[in-house]
């Protein structure tokens, strides 16, 4: 399958340490933790333009970012601290920030929050409404938050404008990831706000290209195995030749997620327990 190129959004000027107004209802405070997996850093979103606000993805354990967040909400009441998933660039600051402002942490039960969230839950505040959308794949507990007033989705790491998302087994699951892409496409959002990088302002073609990329990667893996049995790690140099080599270990994990998906489908079989070095071959 030849997929349409993904129209990545990489034009982004970072503003660290202060709240940046993005829309009438949304501000962002950017953590100074840039890197190959975080782009310019973790963007913590402040939702609401009145006295009471919600905060999404407080971010990494970083005292400077905590101070910036507290300064950004000074004079306001934080009613909810929401977390998309449990990775180290999203979750660690949730508890310290929540305790500092006297607000509950809300997240998937796997993260042991104060209040459990599930698909379809609704969180209401002063002039804003957030609906919970379960989006497993990047992580099993991944949640996204749909803001009804702007028909926008805070997409966490499920969809990022600057890069594809890592899907790393055993937590990451490619079938679940693709199913979650379908759910987001079906919702018809006007804007996606990833935790890393800028917004996706034309979501449908972007999401279609992301899905096409994943299905195309399935085909590339099958073509590689038609030549000879191989492992995810061994396939990386050919399939990710243009990608920063610092990302190759993560790329191997994403290829493993494709191999596990193809094994479920009955197309391939593993010679051992699934891992990045396990050799796979076409079935039959």
Model-derived segments and spans:
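Metallo-beta-lactamase
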Residues: 52-55, 60-62, 129-220, 224
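Active-site HxH/HxHxD metal-binding segment of metal-dependent hydrolases
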Residues: 39-40, 58-131, 140, 151
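Residue-level signal for inorganic ion chemistry
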Residues: 25, 69, 196, 221, ...
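Glycine/proline-rich low-complexity segments that form flexible loops, beta-turns, and polyproline
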Residues: 1-12, 25, 113, 138
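C-terminal regulatory/interaction regions
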Residues: 1-4, 8, 223-284
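Short, structured coil segments at secondary-structure junctions
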Residues: 22, 100-101, 188
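Conserved beta-strand hairpin/beta-sheet module of binuclear metal-dependent hydrolase folds
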Residues: 12, 16-74, 144-156, 161
């Amino acid at each position: 399958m030849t997929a349409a190129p993904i129209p990545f959004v990489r034009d982004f000027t970072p503003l660290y340490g202060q709240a940046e107004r993005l829309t009438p209802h949304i501000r962002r405070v950017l953590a100074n933790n840039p890197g190959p997996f975080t782009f310019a850093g973790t963007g913590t979103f402040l939702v609401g333009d009145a006295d009471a606000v919600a905060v999404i993805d407080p971010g990494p354990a970083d005292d400077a970012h905590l101070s910036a967040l507290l300064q950004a909400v000074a004079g306001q009441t934080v009613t909810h601290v929401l977390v998309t998933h449990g990775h180290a660039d999203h979750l660690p600051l949730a508890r310290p920030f929540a305790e500092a402002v006297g607000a509950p942490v809300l997240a998937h039960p796997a993260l042991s929050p104060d209040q459990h969230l599930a698909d379809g839950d609704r969180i209401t505040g002063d002039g804003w409404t957030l609906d919970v959308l379960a989006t497993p794949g990047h992580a099993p507990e991944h949640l996204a938050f749909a803001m009804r007033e702007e028909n926008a989705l805070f997409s966490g790491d499920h969809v990022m404008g600057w890069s594809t998302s890592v899907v790393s087994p055993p937590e990451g699951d490619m079938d679940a990831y693709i199913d979650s892409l379908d759910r987001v496409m079906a919702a018809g959002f006007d804007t996606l706000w990833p935790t890393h990088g800028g917004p996706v302002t034309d979501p449908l073609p972007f999401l279609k290209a992301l899905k096409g990329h994943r299905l195309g990667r399935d085909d590339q893996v099958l073509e590689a195995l038609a030549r000879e049995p191989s492992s995810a790690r061994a396939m990386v140099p050919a399939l990710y030749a243009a990608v920063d080599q610092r990302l190759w270990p993560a790329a191997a994990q994403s290829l493993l997620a494709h191999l596990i998906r193809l094994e479920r489908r009955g197309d391939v079989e593993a010679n051992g327990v699934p891992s990045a070095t396990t050799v796979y071959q076409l079935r039959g």
